[in-house]
């Protein structure tokens, strides 16, 4: 066996999206902030992103959380997120899963029925409250960073749809185009996954070609994520599907997307401080979102969101990187 690097991961799923948490094998990443660490990784170790996320070790839908040492006082660890096409600032599923892994494997000591874990991210420190039943973590609540509407009441011309109203919202650093499913001509149902992917990719192409999107802290930016959703019913349940990466559809309800949608509903007057939203994914599993407060981001009205979900550990892996392997850095065939 030959390998000049061994990377250990703990695998888990959060509401259906299978993920990995890198726990060792990278060494200490230089940088005073999570952004510094992610940029150093991107500049010097991006081949490990492709090597881990793409085949033969990964697949086109794989999202990976990378654990680092903390960068702020009181934090337990840091996280940034990699996927086949690049990097994410934040990820609810990944943060819920990483907190669950840290507690269930003993990396962070439990404090009783409820344990407070602080996670450093590029969007800022995230306070999590993990609730335990016996040996397992049954739910994790993220007390997250501000979310807001960047552009409201936009209209783009979408192939196969025509004129389509939409909004651009920011959920804890991730930027989303938010589209009403009925107006997009598709239902948010598991059996329509392929059509959701096609429609989402068409919306993303139209948004990036026709809109100028500027976000505080990011400047002019591309929109990589499309949320296709239905308005909450009488019980506050709102189905949604995230289209991301190379045309993938998230099985889970999307944590940062839930925050973006709550910011939009708050902007529309559909949610107030203290209101909750049940964000339902394509598998029928839920995140519960709550608006904990209001704030401002560079003069824009914003919300302080909370999201609660559950993760389950699924395995432990060690990945080898043979210097002689011609596919060491990964590959992805066009589907």
Report each predicted region and the residues it spans.
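Active-site proximal loop and beta-alpha junction motif in alpha/beta enzyme cores
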Residues: 1-90, 97-335
């Amino acid at each position: 066996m030959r390998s000049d690097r061994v990377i250990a991961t703990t695998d888990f799923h959060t509401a259906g999206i299978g993920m990995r948490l890198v726990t060792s094998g990278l060494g200490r990443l230089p940088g005073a902030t999570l952004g510094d660490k992610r940029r150093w990784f991107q500049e010097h170790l991006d081949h490990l992103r492709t090597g881990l996320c793409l085949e033969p070790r990964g697949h086109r839908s794989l999202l990976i959380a990378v654990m680092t040492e903390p960068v702020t006082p009181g934090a337990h660890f840091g996280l940034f997120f990699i996927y086949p096409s690049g990097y994410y600032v934040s990820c609810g599923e990944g943060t819920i899963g990483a907190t669950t892994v840290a507690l269930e494997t003993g990396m962070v000591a439990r404090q009783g029925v409820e344990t407070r874990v602080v996670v450093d991210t590029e969007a800022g420190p995230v306070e999590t409250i993990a609730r335990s039943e016996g040996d397992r973590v049954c739910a994790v609540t993220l007390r997250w960073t501000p979310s807001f509407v960047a552009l409201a009441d936009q209209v783009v011309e979408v192939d196969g749809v025509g004129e389509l109203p939409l909004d651009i919202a920011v959920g804890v650093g991730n930027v989303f185009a938010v589209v009403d499913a009925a107006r997009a001509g598709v239902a948010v149902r598991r059996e329509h996954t392929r059509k959701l992917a096609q429609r989402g990719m068409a919306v993303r192409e139209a948004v990036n070609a026709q809109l100028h999107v500027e976000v505080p802290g990011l400047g002019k930016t591309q929109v990589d994520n499309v949320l296709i959703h239905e308005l909450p019913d009488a019980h506050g349940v709102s189905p949604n599907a995230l289209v991301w990466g190379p045309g993938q559809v998230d099985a889970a309800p999307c944590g940062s997307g839930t925050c973006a949608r709550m910011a939009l509903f708050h902007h529309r007057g559909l949610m107030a401080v203290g209101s909750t939203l049940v964000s339902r994914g394509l598998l029928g599993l839920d995140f519960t979102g709550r608006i904990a407060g209001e704030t401002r981001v560079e003069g824009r009205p914003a919300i302080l969101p909370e999201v609660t979900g559950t993760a389950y550990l699924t395995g432990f892996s060690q990945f080898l990187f043979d210097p002689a392997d011609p596919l060491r850095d990964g590959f992805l065939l066009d589907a």
